[in-house]
Swiss-Prot record:
PANTHER family hit by this protein: F-BOX/KELCH-REPEAT PROTEIN SKIP4, GALACTOSE OXIDASE_KELCH REPEAT SUPERFAMILY PROTEIN
Residues in coiled coil: none
Official protein name in the record: F-box/kelch-repeat protein At3g06570
Parts of the chain that traverse the membrane: none
SUPFAM superfamilies, per the entry: F-box domain, Kelch motif
Gene3D superfamilies: 1.20.1280.50, Kelch-type beta propeller (2.120.10.80)
Keywords: Kelch repeat, Repeat
Domain F-box: 23-69
Organism: Arabidopsis thaliana
């Protein structure tokens, strides 16, 4: 990671957890056995394992490893965070430090930390990223167009943390918003008939991620005049919902009749709170220093209870991001670090919250851990947190 993202810190003496001779002995094992062992190593520790030797670094990004993980039932969620300081966009993934031989003072510090941190992955330097343009399908994170007119689609393969290009959109879109159902990405946005035209048209297209092809038949948008300008989308109970910024209400696409229908829901404006995430048809978002939930089946809102240990998270939704992390909520938030009364740096914190639905109207959370995970210049802002399956 570039040194510009972190202030200088004092170096500590750390005793290596494994000797070189032990590493050499391990590498002398049969390849199939090494593959079987490494496939069981949690993804959180892969960055540490990659330091053992060059062959291990190659193994950790190989298709054979992830096939072995799938066959042995060791697939898991891997958490990512995107931040931005225009025109600079950065991507990070959650990792965990290994157990180490520590001094007494470090033992005391360890009691305050669970060892989680954010490690950099290659940046999406070819295209900007926005909250509504990033979605996850399996082990891939898709970056679709963005807010500037673009037809570009790029994919971050979270197994190897490398970017590649995907089939382009049919037109150059602005105001893009995307959601996923059954490994298909539903994309809405707006396009101009030509470069000089000031008028924009609504556009709706679906990408099949299994075949990597866009649906050849255009979807009907004649009923949605200007409804896709700066919109947000979500799938609730199998319905593709679109909430326009400048129009009241929400529209849902009826695939059987190929038309859009108005729907009533109390979650409408919450779709513009960029902290929100969805877990099992329940929407969660940060609001006024709390984590709130919305259940469309009950058409009601509530607060997640039991989070006193976490303390007050920042009030502004721009300061918080949530993600579905293995069925739990991952929460990212930042706090400014005072530096001679000049706030030049932010500390990003992360927590994992397990959820328990005790009654239809009551959801409780249990804080499993929370840690400071990254220090960044104060100009950086959150884009989105999301999890892939690897």
């Amino acid at each position: 990671m570039s040194s510009m993202l972190s202030p200088p810190v004092k170096k500590r003496k750390i005793v290596a957890p494994q000797s070189q001779s032990a590493s050499a002995s391990f590498q002398s094992l049969p390849d199939d056995l090494i593959l079987s062992i490494v496939a069981r190593v949690p993804r959180l520790y892969h960055r540490t394992v990659s330091l053992v030797c060059k062959s291990f670094r190659s193994l950790l990004v190989s298709p054979e490893l992830y096939k072995a993980r799938s066959v042995s039932g060791h697939t898991e969620s891997c958490l990512y965070l995107s931040i931005a300081c225009y025109p600079d966009y950065r991507m990070f993934t959650l990792c965990r430090k290994p157990d180490q031989t520590l001094t007494t003072s470090e033992e005391e510090e360890k009691k305050k930390s669970n060892g989680y941190y954010l490690a950099p992955v290659p940046d999406p330097d070819s295209h900007p990223v926005y909250f509504s343009s990033l979605v996850t399908v399996g082990s891939d994170i898709y970056n679709i167009a963005g807010s500037h007119a673009s037809s570009n689609v790029s994919i971050l393969d979270c197994r190897s943390n490398t970017w590649r290009e995907a089939p382009r959109l049919g037109v150059e879109l602005t105001s893009v918003s995307a959601s996923v159902l059954d490994r298909k990405i539903f994309v809405v946005g707006m396009y101009a008939d030509d470069e000089e035209s000031e008028s924009k048209n609504d556009f709706f297209e679906v990408l099949d991620t299994e075949t990597h092809t866009w649906d050849p038949q255009p979807f009907n948008c004649s009923e949605t005049k200007d409804k896709f300008l700066n919109c947000r989308t979500a799938f609730i109970d199998g319905k593709f919902l679109v909430k326009p910024w400048i129009h009241r209400g929400v529209v849902a696409y009826n695939s059987k009749e190929s038309r859009w229908e108005p729907v009533q829901t109390k979650m409408a404006m919450s779709m513009f709170n960029d902290s929100y995430c969805q877990i099992h048809n329940v929407i969660y978002l940060a609001f006024d220093g709390r984590i709130r939930w919305y259940d469309d089946a009950l058409n009601c809102w509530g607060d997640v209870q039991g989070l006193l240990e976490l303390g007050n998270i920042p009030h502004g939704p721009s300061c918080v991001r949530l993600a579905d992390y293995r069925g739990n909520i991952a929460v990212f938030w930042f706090r400014y670090l005072p530096d001679n009364d000049d706030y030049k740096w932010k500390m990003i914190w992360c927590a994992e919250i397990a959820l328990e639905r005790r009654t239809s109207w009551e959801i409780w959370g249990k804080v499993l851990w929370f840690d400071p995970v990254l220090t960044v210049p104060a100009d950086y802002e959150f884009v989105k947190a999301l999890a892939a399956t690897v």
